[in-house]
Structures are given as C-alpha cells and as structure tokens.
C-alpha cells in the first residue's frame, strides 16, 4: 500500500512540474532585435513596431517635415 501511494504521489508531482515548466517556457521574454507582441514581451526595452528595442525612436521621412 505504501509503495502504491508513493508511486502515485511521484506521478502527480511529475505532472505538476511539467505544467510549471510549460508555463515558464511560454511566458519567457524576447531578446533585443527579435519579433515581439503584447503576449511575448521584451526582456529589456520596449516593443516598437514589432521589434524589441532599447527605446522607441520616431522616424520621420521627407513628407513629414514642414517646408515653407
């Protein structure tokens, strides 16, 4: 009886550990210069236009400048 109880508890412990590892692996952060979303956040910096960057820079083209 004791062997059966021990094996069942070990089996349940393995299932719990596997579930925890799955949560940790799916919630990990994205390194810099990689694709990011709101569900996959950046490790450092912010998600700018789908890429992890240290800070978001706004790039303006020729059409965005005002000329008199």
Swiss-Prot record:
The cysteine framework is XI (C-C-CC-CC-C-C). Residues 1-26 form the signal peptide. The modification Tyrosine amide is found at residue 60. Expressed by the venom duct. The lineage of its organism: Eukaryota, Metazoa, Spiralia, Lophotrochozoa, Mollusca. Pfam families: Conotoxin_I2 (PF17557). This is conotoxin S11.3. GO terms for cellular component: extracellular region. InterPro entries: Conotoxin-I_CS (IPR013141), Conotoxin_I2 (IPR020242). It is found in: Secreted. Residues 64-68 form a propeptide. GO terms for molecular function: toxin activity. Belongs to the conotoxin I2 superfamily. Disulfide bonds join 29-43, 36-48, 42-52, 47-56. Keywords: Amidation, Cleavage on pair of basic residues, Disulfide bond, Secreted, Signal, Toxin. Transmembrane segments: none annotated. It comes from the Eukaryota.
């Amino acid at each position: 009886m004791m062997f059966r109880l021990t094996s069942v508890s070990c089996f349940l412990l393995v299932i719990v550990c596997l579930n925890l590892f799955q949560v940790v692996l799916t919630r990990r952060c994205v390194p810099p210069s990689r694709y990011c979303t709101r569900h996959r956040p950046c490790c450092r910096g912010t998600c700018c236009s789908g890429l992890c960057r240290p800070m978001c820079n706004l790039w303006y083209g020729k059409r965005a400048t005002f000329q008199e």
